[in-house]
Design a protein with these regions (language model features):
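Surface-exposed, low-hydrophobicity beta-strand/loop segments enriched in small/polar/acidic residues
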Residues: 1-154
Length: 154
């Protein structure tokens, strides 16, 4: 079952800075699922795409991370799991060679996430669980769009 509260954290290990004003984009696509108590069938709900707050004038240096600006409340829907995919448009795609790693900060009924804590340092330092990885394999184009494989998250 997905945690009661959660938030995405994306780490850029692509070897290059991602810059919004040069056409760099981040998009996390997610479809959540639950077993319908009436029919017993799996019901899917496409959640809003999440850009993690990566907006105009934003940049994400190699080796740094962005903590999403959306904290997802799962207390009403009680989703059991979801499928997630990372979609990146890399403005320095020809020079990039590495990964984008997606982590999940989790919280319980108190709503406190690891990313909320005053001692939060980074996804790896705080032991967040990696949920998906996009391996950047350039096709020789800048402003190229790549998508990770779809991963099941529970």
């Amino acid at each position: 079952m997905l945690p009661q509260f959660r938030q995405w954290v994306l780490v850029n290990n692509s070897g290059q800075t991602l810059t919004f004003n040069n056409n760099g984009r981040i998009n996390i696509k997610e479809t959540a699922w639950i077993i319908d108590p009436t029919t017993g069938k799996i019901t899917y709900t496409q959640l809003a795409d999440d850009d993690l707050g990566f907006v105009a004038a934003g940049s994400l240096a190699n080796g740094s991370e962005i903590v999403g600006d959306n904290e997802v409340d799962n207390t009403a829907n009680l989703y059991l799991g979801s499928q997630v995919q990372i979609e990146i448009t890399h403005d320095e795609g020809t020079a990039a060679d590495g990964t984008f790693d997606l982590y999940m900060a989790e919280g319980d009924a108190s709503g406190e996430l690891q990313t909320d804590a005053s001692g939060y340092a980074s996804a790896s330092a705080n032991g967040l669980k990696r949920k998906a990885t996009l391996v950047w394999e350039s096709n020789g184009l800048d402003d190229e769009v790549m998508r990770s494989p779809v991963r099941e998250v529970e």
